[in-house]
Amino acid sequence: MKLVMYAHGGSKNHGCEAIVRTTAKLLTEIDSRPILLSYKKEEDEAYGLYQFVEIRQELHEINKKSPDFMLAYLRQKLFHDYHRMDALMHKKAINELPAIDAALFIGGDNYCYSDVKNYAPINDYMQKKAKKLVLWGTSVEPELLEDKAIREDIKRFDLIVARESISFESLKKVNGNTILLPDPAFHLPCEKVELPEGFVEENTIGINLSPLIIEHEKEKGCVLANYENLMEYIIKETDCQIALIPHVVWESNDDRTPLRQLYEKYKETGRVVLVEDHNCMAQKYIISKCRMFVGARTHATIAAYSTCVPTLVVGYSVKARGI
């Protein structure tokens, strides 16, 4: 059988990286070297994913002289529908695939967000290429399924693997081919690395903060203020160290930006460590050595859950509640 994974954002999001690594390992008996369509091929190469998947660039420049472009342009201008235009960036990579037995939509996180309609035309292209479509390791906001277009997109999948019970209960009402299994990243192994200077094994509280959480705050500044209150309490009332641990390091959405703010404020206490970027397995190892963990990124918290580290999630979507 030949498999392809698509809708992968790139490995500087270590949750995306973890899904690719574990999915490839879990399905190795079906396809020992699946194809990975990636939005950012160079990131995946930098983190070594080429060792077990064939990486292909998913996004390409749109041919503005093509009939597809003209039709998408008219839809955008006449009906304010930009989804077909966005999908054209994916079409070339999908058309160039060999015969595919099963295509796995691995960007299951994306069905938590309001722009999910972008994916229906991409799935249209993939459905013409692959014998079976799978929505892999997904979470879906239940209210999004009230939209007819989103329901129709969900119905097309031959298999849906929901990773938590809230999404499972909602999805199975729309598509009976829905099963419940843990996020594949629960299977991710740790990769031992040297712990940062100042990190005291099993007496360090890990903290992760994301720009996305800050974007969703209802009162400007409240997220950082609450993290500061937490850190001040830990410093004053306990003997624990604090490790600030990034899990997404995209330039446009980099956990290190708010974490550096926190580090600069408290570094003189000698109690705070800013962890550098590593691959997802090494970050999981560092998280596994924490006494407890407070995290915003879904797969940072999965790294903690799956190594039995007590975890508090700072979340804004069904992922945080469900997992």
PLM ranges: what are they?
Residues M1-I323:
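Active-site anion-handling motifs in enzyme catalytic cores
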